[in-house]
Amino acid sequence: MAAAVAAAGAGEPLSPEELVPKAEAEKAEEDLEEDDDDELDETLSERLWGLTEMFPERVRSAAGATFDLSLFVAQKMYRFSRAALWIGTTSFMILVLPVVFETEKLQMEQQQQLQQRQILLGPNTGLSGGMPGALPPLPGKI
């Protein structure tokens, strides 16, 4: 402490360690640790509820109304998306899938006819794309 008085008289600034004696600094740290333990007893919801008191009632009610509105809109959009997905899926299955199946069936039938022609008339008839029932092309003129 005498060093602090001598330094103050010389016009030099004092450091915080020089101002607070060692025993008091240790007590202050223990008090802070005890205060931290007291603060840990609060739950998160209690702390958040306590923070609402620093905002005016008008701001709190506006925030609550905004939250309620956003929740309502989210619920409506969820219900709409479910209904739209159901309508789209069933419409696709009723209107589009039969057409897809029929075109695939037609392609398979054409492929089978082409294979039968190749088996009956020879391997070059499938590639030439001649008229069905026509004579095969001459071997020298391809």
From Swiss-Prot:
Membrane topology of the entry: Single-pass membrane protein
Biased composition (Low complexity): 1-11
Gene Ontology CC, one term: mitochondrial outer membrane translocase complex
Residues bearing PTM N-acetylalanine: 2
Subcellular location field: Mitochondrion outer membrane
Keyword Lipid metabolism: no
Location of region: Import sequence: 41-50
Modified residues annotated as Phosphothreonine in this record: 43
UniProt-listed GO biological process terms: positive regulation of apoptotic process; protein insertion into mitochondrial membrane; protein insertion into mitochondrial outer membrane; protein targeting to mitochondrion
Region feature TMD, mapped onto this chain: 83-103
Top-level taxon: Eukaryota
Cytoplasmic-facing ranges: 2-82
Region listing for C-tail signal, in residue ranges: 123-142
Domain notes: The N-terminal domain (residues 1-60) is important for binding to the unfolded mature imported proteins. Residues (47-69) of the cytoplasmic domain interacts with TOMM20 while the C-terminal segment (residues 61-80) binds presequence of preproteins. Requires the transmembrane domain (TMD), a short segment (the import sequence) in the cytoplasmic domain localizing separately from the TMD and the C-tail signal in the C-terminal domain for efficient targeting and integration into the TOM complex.
Binding partners and assembly: Forms part of the preprotein translocase complex of the outer mitochondrial membrane (TOM complex) which consists of at least 7 different proteins (TOMM5, TOMM6, TOMM7, TOMM20, TOMM22, TOMM40 and TOMM70). Interacts with TOMM40. Interacts with PPP2R2B.
Protein name according to UniProt: Mitochondrial import receptor subunit TOM22 homolog
Gene of this entry: Tomm22
